């Protein structure tokens, strides 16, 4: 594999020599950092099993190597990446997999270790959504996830990835993560804090990642991380699990942050060792039971993961002074909800008791029941999935609801050819050779729902959202 030139500040190299255990070679570390990062994907088990995915993609000649800490994760090698980017494959467009760095799959593996089955989870720094979507798959779309992102520009990307993967149990917020300890104390069974960091572990992906690095900036970042983990710990219920992770390598932003939390709450913090998380985990194990992953150990990004349990309650923080504002939604009455459910079933959309119908003006939404306890405590950017808009003749079903709720085995499902599916993703109307019978057509490809179309004569009117329309080469190889 070709090498690339990474910029290393001298002070960084000195720090790494001190931080690296004697069992590891510093020369191996430098060599690993110079190698480009292996690409990796995670199969979205909300839509397809790993076995079915492997069978579906077998004809492509992809080399898929299992990732030890994630059953649905694979390193991927392809011969035709230049001809067809991985993100333009049919399987990616329909949400069958997520392009995710292998080491970033570790925190969620740790969160669900030992058969942990949380019902209400928070992802404190969620964009672009790799870990939120991984959490949702582990929860099988049950329970509820609060996915927070401080950067306004990244909330849109976060929602797009959640929608593409067919996820229905997520509420999005846009806050500084330091507010949650006061706003929603002891409300979560599990919390993932993948903290903002100096990014020392990503040099294989970005050779210039350390251009602005300095020991002083590490100290400033660590101070913010301590405030974030303190807030997250307050938001965690007694008995709950907190996973703290970063993509950096210095001890100040990693071990020291966790040790600070334990020193602050000595009777409430228990470190849960991760040495048995997967075969070979002990190669990265620290004496506290954390995983400090240098890039040469597993040939991946540098990463850090710690798992903690909150063993007892701690003193509450002062209540926040901000006002949440009026919640603009109201629950749909049972009788009307039954009518809506029946109409939705007619076009192949079904949901279970984990979701409840709410209304705002002419909009119909499905919210995860597990998030209702947070209403009035935080302001949501987006909650659940938008099911439909009502109009005089019935309902205008929404694309995200189709992707999350539709059954490809429904009576109105219509399977497209590869050429027809590509036209659909380009936002064009489709003229199938054999016209479907139904007026509202659930469009599928590879037995996966990809949208809802109106049949007008021999034409299927495209309803694919404009912001998702793709140009350039797609999976049939035509531009």
Curated annotation (Swiss-Prot):
CDD domains: AdoMet_MTases. One of its GO terms (biological process) is rRNA base methylation. S-adenosyl-L-methionine binds at residues 125-131, 149, 176, 194. Its main location: cytoplasm. NCBIfam families: nop2p, PRK11933.1. HAMAP family: 16SrRNA_methyltr_F (MF_01579). One of its GO terms (molecular function) is RNA binding. It comes from Escherichia coli (strain SE11). PROSITE patterns: NOL1_NOP2_SUN, SAM_MT_RSMB_NOP. It catalyses: cytidine(1407) in 16S rRNA + S-adenosyl-L-methionine = 5-methylcytidine(1407) in 16S rRNA + S-adenosyl-L-homocysteine + H(+). This is Ribosomal RNA small subunit methyltransferase F. Keywords: Cytoplasm, Methyltransferase, RNA-binding, rRNA processing, S-adenosyl-L-methionine, Transferase. Specifically methylates the cytosine at position 1407 (m5C1407) of 16S rRNA. The active site is at 247 (nucleophile). It is found in: Cytoplasm. GO terms for cellular component: cytoplasm. Its EC number is 2.1.1.178. The keyword Lipoprotein does not apply. The keyword S-adenosyl-L-methionine applies. Belongs to the class I-like SAM-binding methyltransferase superfamily. RsmB/NOP family. InterPro entries: Methyltr_RsmF_N, MeTrfase_RsmB-F_NOP2_cat, MeTrfase_RsmB-F_NOP2_dom, Nol1_Nop2_Fmu_2, Nop2p, RCMT, rRNA_ssu_MeTfrase_F, RsmB/NOL1/NOP2-like_CS. It is an enzyme of class 2 (transferase).
């Amino acid at each position: 594999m070709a090498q690339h030139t990474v910029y290393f500040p001298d002070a960084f190299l000195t720090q790494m020599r001190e931080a690296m255990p004697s069992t590891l070679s510093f020369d191996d570390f430098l060599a690993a950092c110079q190698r480009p990062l292996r690409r990796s994907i995670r199969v979205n088990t909300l839509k397809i099993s790993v076995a079915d995915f492997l069978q579906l993609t077998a004809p492509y000649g992809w080399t898929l190597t299992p990732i030890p800490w994630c059953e649905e994760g694979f390193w991927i090698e392809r011969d035709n990446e230049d001809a067809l980017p991985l993100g333009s494959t049919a399987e990616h467009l329909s949400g069958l997999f997520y392009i995710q760095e292998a080491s970033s799959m570790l925190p969620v593996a740790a969160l669900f270790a030992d058969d942990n089955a949380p019902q209400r989870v928070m992802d404190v720094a969620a964009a672009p959504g790799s870990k939120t979507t991984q959490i949702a798959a582990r929860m099988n779309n049950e329970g509820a996830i609060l996915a927070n992102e401080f950067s306004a520009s990244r909330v849109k990307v976060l929602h797009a990835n959640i929608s593409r993967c067919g996820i229905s149990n997520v509420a999005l917020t846009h806050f500084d993560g330091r507010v949650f300890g006061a706003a929603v104390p002891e409300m979560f069974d599990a919390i993932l804090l993948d903290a903002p960091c100096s990014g020392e572990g990503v040099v294989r992906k970005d050779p210039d990642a350390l251009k602005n690095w300095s020991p002083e900036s590490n100290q400033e970042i660590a101070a913010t991380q301590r405030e974030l983990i303190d807030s997250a710990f307050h938001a965690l219920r007694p008995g709950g699990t907190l996973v703290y992770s970063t993509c950096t390598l210095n001890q100040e932003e990693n071990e020291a942050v966790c040790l600070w939390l334990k020193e602050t709450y000595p009777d409430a913090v228990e470190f849960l060792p991760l040495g048995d998380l997967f075969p070979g985990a002990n190669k990265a194990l620290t004496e506290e039971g954390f995983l400090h992953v240098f890039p040469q150990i597993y040939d991946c990004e540098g990463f850090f993961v710690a798992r903690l349990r909150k063993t007892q309650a701690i003193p509450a923080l002062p209540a926040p002074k901000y006002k949440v504002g009026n919640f603009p939604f109201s629950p749909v009455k049972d009788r009307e909800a039954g009518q809506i459910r029946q109409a939705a079933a007619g076009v192949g959309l079904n949901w279970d008791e984990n979701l409840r119908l709410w209304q705002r003006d002419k909009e119909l939404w499905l919210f995860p029941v597990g998030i209702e306890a947070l209403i009035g405590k935080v302001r949501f950017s987006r909650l659940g999935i938008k099911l439909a808009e009502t109009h005089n003749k019935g309902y205008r079903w929404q694309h995200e609801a189709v992707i999350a709720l539709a059954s490809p085995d429904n009576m109105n499902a219509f399977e497209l050819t590869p050429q027809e599916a590509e036209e659909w993703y380009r936002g064009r109307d489709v003229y199938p050779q054999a016209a479907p019978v139904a007026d509202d057509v659930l469009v599928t490809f590879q037995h996966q729902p990809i949208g809802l179309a109106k049949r007008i004569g021999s034409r299927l009117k495209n309803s694919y959202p404009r912001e998702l329309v793709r140009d350039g080469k797609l999976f049939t190889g035509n531009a």
